[in-house]
Structure formats: C-alpha cells, structure tokens
Regions:
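Juxtamembrane boundary at the C-terminal end of a transmembrane helix
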Residues: 72-80
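Membrane-interface helix caps and helix-loop-helix hairpins in membrane proteins
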Residues: 27-32, 54-58, 80
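Structural signature of hydrophobic alpha-helical transmembrane segments
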Residues: 29-42
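Hydrophobic residues within membrane-embedded alpha-helical segments of Major Facilitator Superfamily
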Residues: 10, 17, 24, 40-43, ...
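Alpha-helical transmembrane segments and their cytosolic membrane-interface
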Residues: 1-21, 29
C-alpha cells in the first residue's frame, strides 16, 4: 500500500512539474533555456516514467524517458 502511494505521488509530481514548466514558459515567466525549466521538465518526466512503468503503461513511459534524456542533455549543455 505504501509503495503504491509513493509511486502515485511521483506520478502526480511529474504531471504538475511538466505542466508548470510549460505554463510558466508559455506565459513568459521563465525561458526554455533556463535551469529551472529543464529541472522541472526532467524531474517531472522521471516521475511520469516511474508511475507509467509501474502501471505497465509503456507509451508514456518511453516518451518521458526520452523527455528526461533531452532535459539532461540541455542541463549538461548549460554547464559546458
């Protein structure tokens, strides 16, 4: 029971983080090339990956794995 709750929390965090990043960028509060934007996208995608694979929903799991990789590359480029 506790494991399922924790996984659901990861999933909801992921949803809120990705939607927040998109909304903040769309309303010009943050730019897409900022660290906070990429962190929200990357950590949000990780949360969705966790809940997706737990529920055996592989399409969103694969999509968000790719999303995580893109965010990680963008973050690395900021520091190179």
């Amino acid at each position: 029971m506790m494991k399922k709750l924790v996984i659901e929390i990861f999933g909801w965090y992921g949803t809120v983080a990705i939607v927040s990043a998109y909304a903040l960028n769309s309303f010009s509060v943050i730019q897409a090339n900022t660290l906070i934007y990429q962190i929200l996208n990357g950590t949000g995608a990780i949360g969705i990956v966790i809940v997706s694979f737990y529920k055996k929903a592989y399409q969103p799991g694969v999509l968000n794995t790719i999303w995580t990789i893109i965010a990680a590359i963008a973050i690395m480029k900021m520091f190179i």
